[in-house]
Amino acid sequence: MRESIAEIAQALGYPYQVAEEQVISGVAIDSRAVQPGDLFVALQGEQTDGHRYLSQALERGAAGVVISQADAIDVYQLQNYILVQDGAVFLQQLAHWLRNKMNIPVIGVTGSTGKTSTKDFLAALLSSLGNVVVTKGNHNNELGVPLTICQLEPDTNALVVEMGMRGLGQIDFLCKIAEPAYGLITNIGKTHCELLGSQENIAQAKCELLAYIPEHGVVALNSNDRALVAPWLETCKGRIVWYDGSGQDVTADYRAEEIVQHETGITYRLCYGEHRQQIDLAVHGVHNVSNSLAAIAIAHQLGVAWEQIGEALKQVKLTGMRLDIAKAPNGVVVINDAYNANPDSMKSAISVLMHQKGGRKVAVLGDMYELGKYEIESHQEVGRQAAIQEVDYVIAVGQLGALIGKSAQEAGCQVAFATDNNQAIQYLQAYLKADDVVLVKGSRGMKMEQIVQNLMG
């Protein structure tokens, strides 16, 4: 961004003071992340109060601050400030104002799983358009989305916004800020059933995106979810395109055929109308066929050429802890998929494990959260899949992970049960030898990267 404090305050209708006008180059809500020229927004929350860190923000070079406590002006002898009622509301208003100053394609990305990987694919595909601003990390909520939008620069050519959801109305709220003209929904899974009760309710929440797609816009939807999203399709004014990463739906606009997993990634044949093209992905997991297709659909609709699509996908590197494969000092191959877990990604990760060359195949599998009524059957299903794929050794971590282990054990797998990550590490230390391949995967709350860190020394 390249706006002054006065311009921002006047546009949004807030009182302000400027002793020395400076151009704001960014926005921060964490004083430790402030860069020279940033506008520091002091947020008040239940756990902390950003006003306590005004001095640190100014010492790090903040060009101005946004406060909701008037007494901070004298306490910290503030020179450049905007006085607001609520820092979070200000941040959202600022983002909405900045977004509407830019005549660029804005793409909203949501779905039960695969949002971040799909965003990574889309960012790579849109790079041919020029400067693309993309959600960093998991900045996909009511604070993260505005912070992403505040990264817009005069030369930005596209904006990709990941949108998370933990209840009805949240996608709607984020769309009011970002106003996406393009969108994609990766899938309607069982994650969040604990919060929303059913896949139908999850579909309703995710499909809040559709109402914001204008007549000139496009949304890409997973053909496997046709029945779930059907009630909400009429809310979309724009064009709907369907993609299918399973190779089963010949009616999908974008579909994959001849999917082949290998040790270094995945290849498949992309089909769109009469067009046929081989796609080479240097990433693992058959679920990434669907994720890449969703990104291809939007990129193609935005005018990215087929040749550029093929070349860009060869170079994609996904956000960390998503099927990262590395060799430990002791010669063990480690597959780090510890960022998060759901039933489909668990089964896909097990498939990646079994496609690796090497010695014995070991799966360290932990709890999957927020599955609601599907909790027991989903964990049991993963255990059966481990047995079907003939995993040599399963280490089941956690109370829910034990359901995976019991199911795998009943189906013939060798299984050890660990109450926590430390016990899982002890089992691995006693079992592993050079050339064994280990998959580590569980929900974010399990923090199973601790196991990976131990394995990697």
Predicted regions: what they are:
Residues 47, 319, 338-413:
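Active-site beta-alpha connecting loops in nucleotide-dependent enzymes
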Residues 82-86, 415-424:
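Short acidic-hydrophobic, aromatic-tinged amphipathic segments that line or gate anion-handling sites
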Residues 109, 320-324, 445-453:
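ATP-dependent carboxylate/acyl-activation modules
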Residues 71-76, 184-333, 358-359, 384-387, ...:
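Acidic, Mg2+-coordinating active-site environments of NTP-dependent enzymes
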Residues 190-196, 335, 368-373, 440:
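A short acidic, helix-capping loop that chelates divalent metal ions and anchors anionic groups
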Residues 6-10, 89-223, 227-236, 430, ...:
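Phosphate-binding loop of NTP-binding sites
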Residues 1-93, 97, 356, 384-385, ...:
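N-terminal leader/targeting and accessory segments in enzymes
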Residues 8, 38, 57, 94, ...:
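Residue-level signal for inorganic ion chemistry
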